[in-house]
Amino acid sequence: MNIADGRQAFPAPAKLNLDLRITGRREDGYHNIESIFCLIDLQDTVYLKPRDDGKIILHNPVGGIPQEADLSYRAASLLQKYARNPAGVEIWLDKKIPTGAGLGGGSSDAATVLLVLNRWWQCSRTTQQLIDLGATLGADVPFFIFGKNAFASGIGEKLIGMDIPKQWYVIVKPPVHVSTAKIFTHEGLTRNSASSIMPTFQNLQPFRNDMQAVVFKEYPEVWKAYSELSRYGFALMTGSGACVFTACQDRDSAYNIYRQVSGLYEAYLAEGLSKHPLLSV
């Protein structure tokens, strides 16, 4: 994990929403959801180097945005007030998870920063306290802090561990960026799905994504990618898109599909994880 210049490398895995239902709109403008979150081994690497001068420096903000707007920088800044000593950090992001894809890359990076700096800075935040902090950064951050496959409700911050069968996933990213805000404010979005009484992996099947129909209508490229992937099995969109995926029981089956679609689209072959890699560190 250690590399020559004093930085340390930490994993930030992606996620898939194997099922996503919108159960209502909240008074604060957010939506209540119910979703199955699954970790996969497609991951970014977050490099961190401690500082003792209290400065937080993000060396390569994603997409050219100001560092103060980046989720990883904001995560460190949010946690800093709990540090026992004047603590700082330098951050580098090695991005492998595509952005704007529904895979949670930015949220996962932020969660990794919170998890590591909570130890480094001796902040003594519990997992639940970190989840509460993460929820102020984004709806997906709590799941990555929770660190296990889960059934999520609320805006995504209420999490219950869920056993998910070992699966391989073929993920296709169409050449388009989906605006999450546009989808959540769309008049055609389903917002009244019934809440689950017994939320288990088996009981929630057949899986669906309540955002999918609206995204297909507004972004034909996502529909095209979904249609192509559906030739090989049951396909579904993750999050608010743009990625679509299909699940396989073994790597060989997944690889055969990956070979077919990777010539047409940016595609990924990923294995499902049972827990966040940082839980093993």
Swiss-Prot record:
Q: Where does the signal peptide begin and end? A: none
Which HAMAP family has this protein been placed in? IspE
- Sample GO molecular function, one term: 4-(cytidine 5'-diphospho)-2-C-methyl-D-erythritol kinase activity
Q: What is this protein called?
A: 4-diphosphocytidyl-2-C-methyl-D-erythritol kinase
Pfam families assigned to the protein according to its UniProt record, in alphabetical order: GHMP_kinases_C, GHMP_kinases_N
Metabolic or biological pathway = Isoprenoid biosynthesis; isopentenyl diphosphate biosynthesis via DXP pathway; isopentenyl diphosphate from 1-deoxy-D-xylulose 5-phosphate: step 3/6
Q: What does this protein do?
A: Catalyzes the phosphorylation of the position 2 hydroxy group of 4-diphosphocytidyl-2C-methyl-D-erythritol.
Q: What is its EC number?
A: 2.7.1.148
Annotated active site = K15, D140
* Family the entry assigns: Belongs to the GHMP kinase family. IspE subfamily.
Which leading EC class covers this enzyme?
transferase
Q: Which reaction does it catalyse?
A: 4-CDP-2-C-methyl-D-erythritol + ATP = 4-CDP-2-C-methyl-D-erythritol 2-phosphate + ADP + H(+)
NCBIfam families named in the record: ispE
Q: What's the domain of life for this entry?
A: Bacteria
Kindly state a single biological-process term from the GO annotations of this entry: isopentenyl diphosphate biosynthetic process, methylerythritol 4-phosphate pathway
Protein source organism: Neisseria meningitidis serogroup C (strain 053442)
